[in-house]
Amino acid sequence: MPEPAKFAPAPKKGSKKAVTKAQKKDGKKRKRSRKESYSIYVYKVLKRVHPDTGIWCKAMGIMNSFLNDIFERIAGEASRLAHYNKRSTITSRRSRRPCACCCPASWPSTPCPRAPRRSPSTPAPSESLPGPGARSLPPSLPPRVAGCFVSKGSFQGHLTPLVK
């Protein structure tokens, strides 16, 4: 008498487990590997800013790769600055400078809602602004050629080079 063929039981109607699991040839179930992405966060921000607007899958992929690239740049610059200053940890205060270095020149001039604001009478910390011998750049050079820039003062948009 022939043996009955071993098949996986058919998924019940409305069951979502069949969608999330892939089948091997020997009948054992295997979970798909999870991919991390920023798509849910991009979607939440989009709905908060423009509630009636949607986003295509390809556009979400572009936004995801953009955010990965920005975070890689910021992390690389932060670790480089921590190494230069002989620090083993990166604090939240020290993370603003790499953001200013990696982002376009207009981004650091936009204040963050949670960023601590410094009054004009308070002296600037020595590590965030260049010394008195800092040279200004000629206006013909693009900002990326000369190096990083930071906002001067309390987010007034006046940019000065970090290079001495």
From Swiss-Prot:
List of residues that carry N6-(beta-hydroxybutyryl)lysine: 6, 12, 17, 21, 35, 86
Modification N6-crotonyllysine, positions: 6, 12-13, 16-17, 21, 24, 35
A Pfam family that the UniProt record links to this protein: Histone
Residue positions where N6-succinyllysine is found in the record: 35
GO MF annotations, alphabetized: DNA binding; protein heterodimerization activity; structural constituent of chromatin
Subunit structure: The nucleosome is a histone octamer containing two molecules each of H2A, H2B, H3 and H4 assembled in one H3-H4 heterotetramer and two H2A-H2B heterodimers. The octamer wraps approximately 147 bp of DNA.
Name recorded for this polypeptide: Putative histone H2B type 2-D
Annotated source species: Homo sapiens (Human)
Species lineage: Eukaryota, Metazoa, Chordata, Craniata, Vertebrata
The gene coding this protein: H2BC19P
